[in-house]
């Protein structure tokens, strides 16, 4: 969170399905003296926010756990302002067999990870179909991405339709 400490005029909203994770985030923010952070327990598949509410949507290690990934992608797109940035990272399958086996044998039974999973290629296709200026990479089984929600006029010029 050190970067967040420099964003004194930013309004930061943290949402997690797990009350335990929200508690940990709240404690960390308090230790750091952050004042501009709101915490809310909720489901990314049904975000409790108006359309075009956020300049940035950041998802760290979430999409591999979400039970309804399609709803999560739709909702993050919906709440992001045109011209806003969607970024994050999460597990992708097919990059390291050892990690794939660990996920299947350990994390899925514990309900920490929920199939189906993206591959690097499927994530690229998905993000390029929804966003512009897609930057995507991976370090073994963790993919990272940064992309922009284009403004409607820009999308129309490119021949895409929302």
Regions found by a protein language model. Give the residues of each.
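Class I SAM-dependent methyltransferase SAM/SAH-binding core
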Residues: 1-46
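Short glycine-centered segments of the SAM/dcSAM-binding site in methyltransferase folds
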Residues: 11, 83-85
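Short N-terminal helix/helix-N-cap motif within the alpha/beta-hydrolase-1
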Residues: 20, 67-71
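A short acidic, Gly/Pro-enriched loop at the edge of an enzyme's catalytic core
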Residues: 45-57
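A short SAM/SAH-binding and catalytic strip from SAM-dependent methyltransferases
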Residues: 55-68
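A short glycine-rich, Lys/Arg-flanked "PGG" loop and its adjoining helix->strand segment in the class I
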Residues: 70-82
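C-terminal alpha-helical "lid/dimerization" subdomain adjacent to the S-adenosyl-L-methionine
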Residues: 87-145
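C-terminal lobe and adjacent flexible extensions of AdoMet/dcAdoMet transferase-like proteins
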Residues: 145-162
């Amino acid at each position: 969170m050190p970067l967040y400490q420099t964003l004194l005029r930013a309004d930061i909203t943290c949402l997690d399905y797990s009350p335990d994770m929200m508690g940990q985030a709240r404690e960390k923010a308090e230790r750091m003296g952050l004042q501009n952070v709101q915490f809310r327990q909720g489901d990314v598949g049904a975000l409790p926010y108006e359309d075009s509410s956020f300049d940035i949507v950041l998802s760290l290690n979430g999409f591999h756990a979400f039970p309804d990934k399609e709803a999560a992608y739709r909702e993050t797109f919906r709440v992001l302002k045109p011209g806003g940035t969607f970024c994050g990272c999460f597990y992708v399958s097919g990059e390291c067999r050892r990690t794939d086996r660990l996920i299947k044998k350990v994390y899925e039974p514990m309900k920490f990870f929920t199939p189906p999973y993206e591959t690097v290629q499927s994530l690229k296709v998905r993000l390029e179909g929804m966003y512009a200026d897609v930057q995507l990479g991976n370090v073994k089984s963790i993919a990272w991405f940064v992309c922009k929600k284009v403004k409607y006029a820009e999308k129309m010029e490119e021949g895409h339709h929302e």
